[in-house]
């Protein structure tokens, strides 16, 4: 018997129904949320991501604010765009689409975002608030993963979760979310320096793979019945490929498809962060 699919698309659609109602209420109060994007250059992947985000906005009634800039802009020109969105009352929250061209400092650009308008939940101030247990925008992908597990009744409280990958967008904040009292999981954070990774993953009730190494998590690394969340993105022969091998579906209890698992929820919680930011102004 194969694993249950952690279907992110259906779950995203449920979130969109809720968001559409909340946005309508905000609009009735004269406070329609606005999501901004800053896109530098013409990377096809980045363009596709930004198009998708604005298509999502249209579905739930959020206003779109786009700032598309040429690849050869200076740091000063990028800073001017960020400052303009920081001051723009129609922009509730926004993102700077990564990666930026190599002559631009990504960290400096992200730090320049007003933390109150940080739609991704990755500003150093907001990550610091997460560490302290204070209210702040949450990182979209980790938040989406927790929601997906809860949606399919995967037990989190008391579970041993092995996170593979220590990146800023998933690996590091994932542990912060899962060890909050509201989740109460025990987290082991693994990476390229981890010795005997399979020995750790075989103990896990939940595995979250976020390294971008195609099919690195195989069936022999998974405890029967465990939940496996695939966040990795690679291209193999031109096709998007995740970190989880196909044979894992025969051993695990739950597996997120990739694509179609976590990705839709990352986008859904980007919009959720913006809606919550606008709602907080009315509170």
Swiss-Prot record:
Return the Gene3D superfamilies for the record.
Leucine Dehydrogenase, chain A, domain 1, NAD(P)-binding Rossmann-like Domain
Q: Which residues bind NADP(+)?
A: 165-167, 192, 233
List keywords of the entry alphabetically.
Amino-acid biosynthesis, Histidine biosynthesis, Hydrolase, Methionine biosynthesis, Multifunctional enzyme, NADP, One-carbon metabolism, Oxidoreductase, Purine biosynthesis
EC number(s) stated in the UniProt entry for this protein: 1.5.1.5, 3.5.4.9
- List GO BP terms, alphabetically: L-histidine biosynthetic process; methionine biosynthetic process; purine nucleotide biosynthetic process; tetrahydrofolate interconversion
Task: Provide the function of this protein.
Answer: Catalyzes the oxidation of 5,10-methylenetetrahydrofolate to 5,10-methenyltetrahydrofolate and then the hydrolysis of 5,10-methenyltetrahydrofolate to 10-formyltetrahydrofolate.
Q: What is this protein called?
A: Bifunctional protein FolD
Q: What is the lineage of its organism?
A: Bacteria, Bacillati, Actinomycetota, Actinomycetes, Mycobacteriales
Q: Which gene encodes it?
A: folD
